[in-house]
């Protein structure tokens, strides 16, 4: 359930919106989230989703979902469907049906014809190499194309023939006629159409010319009546072109959109480049786009992150124009905080050590009811059985304990969570000297109460060996060992391959044992394994016969760079 407190506090975009509403410039807020369907959404997109949909929610406006699908070779329906699923999973709903820039191709073409008729666009025959040469540099003005002064009639004829498929791919472009000497390179006669014979996921083979992003985006905003078009800072230099296009076409809507920029999220210890994420998938460094180590929304969902936790992270990351570098611990902290409140508890033992309770009757089973959550009675209770043989964590026993060790030691006592106080009477070892079993006695008078005359400080978790569910546990950790894996230079000053910094210990699969309540859980069921961390049943591989749990995050931030 959304509420207005879940979104970023007052920031400069909210100030702009409130001033626009107060002045009457706009009577309602209309935003949009405009992904290109050429990959899966990642954590950076989650921030943008929360911003655009969140602002619409806060100010009782609307937010469109629009697919900027102008690159047919890279886009497909798989990505479209995945994006829609991710947005809905995050808790948001778009206004009306999803939009596609490709739905506006006819209008975009008509506007281009109008620009030609007004002498503001021309067909160019320069090759890409020649165009780069004519474009100039940041310190040197560009040169006019020799085709810049074609007549309106010739340009209309050539553009029509481009549309009809009479010319080879890449042989001609349509360019805006602006200023080749502009200090902003984006304003040096930018290309707005190119010839590209490619099947389009939405329009099929209807078109062999496709509009460019800078031309399409602003017109799509205008058609949809967007009031505040929000994008990341790398588009700041494109804003003059955004305004220029809209200044030179008939207004498609009474509302004129305005572009505003905010800083891109940079999350440490990961990457968000779609190209590099795709490389990880193609080269099989990960199992797919939804691998729980990936920063994709589908990967984080499979890892066990919650929509509420991601919205909390987006709020804490904030919105500004300054550099937005955020440590992974901030993301993990937000997830941990949300799960602390929402995840029911179970006990599980990841590294089992056998314990025989010598004074517990052989063949007898006793059980005690325990709450699923200490602060949420509504989550109910479960039966926790105990039998003569139990498993505890091997780390919860030490023959030669370090200072301050409060768990089980030879001759020492510890309380079993939800159970008795036990005392270690004997340590059993194998031929190699490894501890393989503890023989302990229970204090029968300590079930649910403290022992008389002594204080037992340590409390450990455990499971009944007879009743435990055998589970598969995947212990996930950070995918990379350095903060910026794609920004490390070698001795020669060149960037090193980001794959050099993959964490070889980013996943480890083990067999563990959990309370019997773990046997019949549905997929995507999130739990706290007491004293260990937060886990989720895998949404793909989990089943009744083969329970699979993914570690979402540890109870505390224990990351140490490798």
UniProtKB/Swiss-Prot annotation:
Underlying gene: glnS
Chemical reaction(s) catalysed: tRNA(Gln) + L-glutamine + ATP = L-glutaminyl-tRNA(Gln) + AMP + diphosphate
One Pfam family recorded for the sequence: tRNA-synt_1c
Matches recorded under Gene3D superfamilies: HUPs, Ribosomal Protein L25, Chain P
Enzyme Commission no: 6.1.1.18
The name this protein goes by in its record: Glutamine--tRNA ligase
Biological-process GO terms, alphabetical: glutaminyl-tRNA aminoacylation; glutamyl-tRNA aminoacylation
Enzyme class, UniProt record, top EC level: ligase
